[in-house]
């Protein structure tokens, strides 16, 4: 599990982590932009190391429920700040008000995409869209 730190700088003070949209391994940007790296771990440091070691190949990272539960909104923010697009795979499914608020938080920290269950119905799905849009503004 991720330990508590005062800031993201403290969390990563011993790590060198620089993301470049230019690939050193000559992976074309149009390919890199279509690939997502699934960060299916429960530790933000491990996720960051994994993304850092593979940044030449992926333009998007997927933050799932496991990592988001362990590290919270920082699990999205640290990767958007590093230049990745973030797909937040939280599978939102609740009352529309709750889904709206959750999607707004995820959007405010930079997630480009978030999943929501269609079985939640039209009102809930619209709430997810509106929340993500509001958070991104």
Protein language model regions, located:
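Acidic, serine/threonine- and proline-rich low-complexity intrinsically disordered segments
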Residues: 1-11
